UniProtKB/Swiss-Prot annotation:
Keyword Transmembrane annotated: yes
GO terms (BP aspect): cellular response to hypoxia; defense response to bacterium; defense response to virus; response to bacterium; response to salicylic acid; response to wounding
Main localization category: membrane
Gene Ontology CC, one term: Golgi apparatus
Protein name listed in UniProt: NDR1/HIN1-like protein 3
Source organism: Arabidopsis thaliana
Superkingdom of the organism of origin: Eukaryota
Length: 231
């Protein structure tokens, strides 16, 4: 056996080959679009998120530009006249009512029109609803325009007044001046030039004091009343 501790004069021994070990994808990024399929959907979610952010920013910019161009002002509602010919609560809690209402709707905008697709009027005494009307026809209101609409609430309704509401009613019966709320539910769209907006549903509330017309001795005359508009 040759002496292993002796010198070796043969050909040089090549260095050992490096073995590479795959440890999967490095880093938190997902690379190009072709790598997205193997990225457990993270790339797709990132793209969708970026698209949504871009759309939101563009919509915000568009809304700002529209506002700067058109400078929208709030629509104004007034009850110009109210006529109450009956408002009687019988012992069985049936309320008989007959109320005529006239409204003015003012569009103060110079460049914005309004489509009134639906107007529903409800009558309330305290928190109790006693009547509803949706017989106002839909219409378009142009720039800087005032429109007069009217409706009638008539019929009978079971109402269950609490102690405070019954006390208020007794006071109103004695004075013959009734504290009635008219609430409007609208479906409207705005027109900006050739562009029509999506549908809005503002709520209108009018706090009224209406004299009973059969009583001519109170001397109280209905006063036109501005309504609160809540978009």
């Amino acid at each position: 056996m040759a002496d292993l501790n002796g010198a070796y004069y043969g050909p040089s021994i090549p260095p050992p080959k490096k073995v590479s070990h795959s440890h999967g994808r490095r880093g938190g990024g997902c690379g190009c679009l072709g790598d997205c399929l193997g990225c457990c959907g993270c790339c797709i979610l990132s793209v969708i998120f970026n698209i949504l952010i871009t759309i939101a920013v563009l919509l915000g910019i568009a809304a700002l530009i529209i506002w700067l161009i058109f400078r929208p002002n709030a629509i104004k509602f007034h009850v110009t006249d109210a006529k109450l010919t009956e408002f009687t609560l019988d012992p069985t809690n049936n309320l008989r009512y007959n109320l005529d209402l006239n409204f003015t709707i003012r569009n103060p905008n110079r460049r914005i029109g309004v489509y009134y697709d639906e107007i529903e009027v409800r009558g309330y005494y305290g928190d109790q609803r006693f009547g509803m009307s949706n017989n106002i026809s839909k219409f378009y209101q142009g720039h800087k325009n005032t429109t007069v609409v009217g409706t009638k609430l008539v019929g009978q309704q079971l109402v269950l007044l609490d102690g405070g509401e019954r006390k208020d009613l007794n006071e109103d019966v004695n004075s013959q001046i009734y504290r009635i709320d008219a609430k409007l539910r609208l479906k409207i769209r705005f027109k900006f030039g050739l562009i029509k907006s999506w549908r809005f549903k503002p709520k209108i509330k009018c706090d009224l004091k209406v004299p009973l017309t059969s009583n001519s001795t109170s001397g109280f005359v209905f006063q036109p009343t501005k309504c609160d508009v809540d978009f």
